[in-house]
């Protein structure tokens, strides 16, 4: 059974699609359900994570700089297979503890994004481990934390909105009001990875819509053709903005113009928000109508 604080976070996370307030407000969180190393019982705990530019995500077994590794880390050493909840999707993953060289590089990236990790490391003699979570491929659609196609669409869209808000906040912290980099705050490697992960996620989402839900709705609702055509055009426009953002953040750090990148993030935010809202207005009523299925 989680401690009372963790249990409150878990319940709030599940009730609000991954959003929590208080101490963890605005944080990137996962729920990890591991198998107890001694008991074999399931054990769920909230853990902060970092995107890694692709399918895997990274978690840090800091335990706040405590002398001992957290229980969930011991569980993963004994049983690497776990269940991950990210607020949108629920999936099985395999945990891999990073080897020293990769661990050091990733931990440095995390410290650059949040110096608190260095403070945790300074408090303990143990080397704080970094763990990569690799999703297990599965047949069929992903397990979305939603009860219907309409709810799933909204949950996924809200996750993109939330991640884009976080990235905008991170860029704002790294860019001065005059469009120059804030002294002492680099345009860090993890922020670049966050952007690239968002770009890939949006590409995957739009590709899935065009191969799945759009043809389904076009067959059932021919009157929706003009709206679907508009949505496809907007997908093309957003793809152009994503490619511009990819190229900008892929440049060498010294060549990156942080003010220019921030303006690209702002433009993407404006156009994506309008697109998501229009898509919801057009599709959700049809997805909630009688006969619509998951």
Segments from the language model and where they lie:
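Glycine-rich, pocket-lining loop/helix-strand segments that form or immediately flank
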Residues: 9, 74-77, 99
